Amino acid sequence: MVEINAYSKKKDGAKKLSTNFTVKEFACNDGTDAVFVAPRLVMVLQSIRSHFGKAVNINSGYRTPPYNAQVGGVDGSQHTYGTAADISIKGVSVADVAAYARSIMPDWGGVGIYKEQGFVHVDARETRADWNG
């Protein structure tokens, strides 16, 4: 089972989860205070950040189930567990981000390429999953 930590955006928002990521970056865009984040998702994102040497923009991290439904997310989305993030890096193609993410999660984790929307979905699930959105 993937470890997931719970935080409060109000109390813990500025808390560093790694060198370059804080709790508030993973918060649901609906304003909910609760934030759930899997440490191994943070590890993957930090590795991506370090590899490309550029800021990783988290477009969507944790989502409450109602917010996930509102934005058209699938039932049981990894976002609703705190194990997923949709990311983009200015000046780096989604194909390059996805290829690197796949290389550091050879036997686990999900990587979805959303070329038209300009982001990559990365998640810390226990099994391997790859797709193009």
Residue ranges of model-derived segments:
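Extracytoplasmic cell-surface/polysaccharide-interacting catalytic and binding patches
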Residues: 1-51, 117, 125-133
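Feature targets compositionally biased, intrinsically disordered low-complexity regions
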Residues: 12, 30, 60, 71-75, ...
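Residue-level signal for well-ordered alpha-helical segments
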Residues: 25, 35, 57, 64-66, ...
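N-terminal start-of-chain detector that recognizes signal peptides
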Residues: 29-31, 56-62, 92-96
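Extended, low-complexity, intrinsically disordered C-terminal regulatory tails
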Residues: 40-72
